[in-house]
Swiss-Prot record:
It is found in: Cell inner membrane. It comes from Nitrosomonas europaea (strain ATCC 19718 / CIP 103999 / KCTC 2705 / NBRC 14298). It holds the Pfam family MraY_sig1. It catalyses: UDP-N-acetyl-alpha-D-muramoyl-L-alanyl-gamma-D-glutamyl-meso-2,6-diaminopimeloyl-D-alanyl-D-alanine + di-trans,octa-cis-undecaprenyl phosphate = di-trans,octa-cis-undecaprenyl diphospho-N-acetyl-alpha-D-muramoyl-L-alanyl-D-glutamyl-meso-2,6-diaminopimeloyl-D-alanyl-D-alanine + UMP. Its EC number is 2.7.8.13. Its main location: membrane. Signal peptide: none annotated. It comes from the Bacteria. This is Phospho-N-acetylmuramoyl-pentapeptide-transferase. HAMAP family: MraY. PANTHER family: PHOSPHO-N-ACETYLMURAMOYL-PENTAPEPTIDE-TRANSFERASE (PTHR22926), PHOSPHO-N-ACETYLMURAMOYL-PENTAPEPTIDE-TRANSFERASE HOMOLOG (PTHR22926:SF5).
């Protein structure tokens, strides 16, 4: 929107051509989303509190969590509002990737919103059934996967890139590309949701990974940089850096309210949407393996749940004191802030390793 306006003004005032630079618009998007979140955040939290949109707490969890009961949830609507409004303002709205990512984010956010609404507004403790959630997640993810497969311009746009090796890629073909895309989007969405169990635990890794994906998107969309770094050139993917900038800014602002002791939780509306956004951006810029590296905390959290369930069903024993993994460490005696900050540190290290794959080939 503002890009189109600046291009129109630039016909008379050439200085406005500066807004055509993706790097500038990415920074402005981060600042805009940050500002929007800070402006409307307090009012939204007050509204959620007044409506008694409070979080329920598991009785079988750490006893320290009982004080969290009643804390406003569905704060993910704040993040989504800031991200989408900012994207509409600063991104090139003729770019199809912007719409793919935005609509995917909103779609998964809608699933999470319905789940949260049923749990906290209608007082239905089960919320949206697991099968219903999985069904709608699958529908959206498959639609996105098929669309990306059908619109892939070159064979390398559907290859799996192997990091740390120069020009090593695994041809997937249409079917395997669709399967991989589906797994990445649905898997990342649910992994972020599982991680969102402590104050600030999920949002900061999301911010760090989003910032890294902004760099991957920018270089993938730049023919010269992509060739130099030995990664696939994805025309027009650079515009996704603007979306990532908005997500980074909105996420940092949300952390202001979500840090311990949290004033608001993001709820499924935020966690499912943010995970899906990271997943679909990763697929577009062809960095699925790198996402597994950078999102190691999300991977560990999801695996801990799968291992716990499988072990109990098969052998009647639990591997962890409690799943997801962050609760295991709490029950071992770690304070909540210790778990959160240590997981942040792990994510920072993994993100730096992920970024190093751009050069270490």
């Amino acid at each position: 929107m503002l890009l189109a306006l600046s291009q129109w003004i630039a016909e008379d005032i050439r200085a406005f051509n500066v807004f055509s630079y993706i790097t500038l618009r990415t920074m402005l998007a981060a600042l805009t989303a940050l500002s929007i979140s800070f402006l409307i955040g307090p009012a939204m939290i007050r509204s959620l509190t007044a409506r008694k949109v409070g979080q329920s707490v598991r009785n079988d969890g750490p006893q320290s969590h009982l004080i969290k009961a009643g804390t406003p949830t569905m704060g993910g609507t704040l993040i989504l509002t800031a991200v989408i409004v900012t994207t509409l303002l600063w991104a090139d709205l003729s770019n199809r990737y912007i719409w793919v990512v935005s609509l995917t984010t909103l779609g998964f956010g809608a699933i999470g919103w319905v789940d949260d609404y049923r749990k906290v507004i209608q007082r239905n403790s089960k919320g949206l059934s697991a099968s219903s959630k999985f069904f709608w997640q699958s529908i959206i993810a498959l639609l996105v996967a098929v669309y990306l497969a059908m619109t892939a311009d070159l064979p390398q746009h559907t290859e799996m890139i192997v990091p740390f090796f120069k020009e090593v890629a695994i041809p997937l073909g249409t079917f395997l590309f669709i399967v991989l895309t589906y797994l990445v989007i649905v898997g990342t969405s649910n992994a972020v949701n599982l991680t969102d169990g402590l104050d600030g635990l999920a949002i900061m890794p999301t911010v760090m990974i989003s910032g890294a994906l902004a760099i991957f998107a920018y270089v993938a969309g730049h023919a010269v940089f992509a060739k130099y770094l030995g990664i696939p050139h994805i025309p027009n993917a650079g515009e996704l850096a603007v979306f990532c900038g908005a997500l980074t800014g909105a996420g940092l602002a949300f952390l202001w309210f979500n840090t311990y002791p949290a004033e608001v939780f993001m709820g499924d509306v935020g966690a499912l949407a943010l995970g899906a956004a990271l997943g679909v951006i990763t697929v577009i810029v062809r960095q699925e393996i790198v996402l597994v590296i950078m999102g190691g905390v999300f991977v560990m959290e999801a695996l801990s749940v799968m291992i716990q369930v499988a072990s109990y069903k098969l052998f009647g024993q639990r591997v962890f004191r409690m799943a997801p993994l962050h609760h295991h460490y709490e029950l071992k005696g770690w304070k909540e802030n210790q778990v959160v900050v240590r997981f942040w540190i792990i994510t920072l290290i993994l993100v730096l390793i992920g970024l190093s794959t751009l050069k270490l080939r």
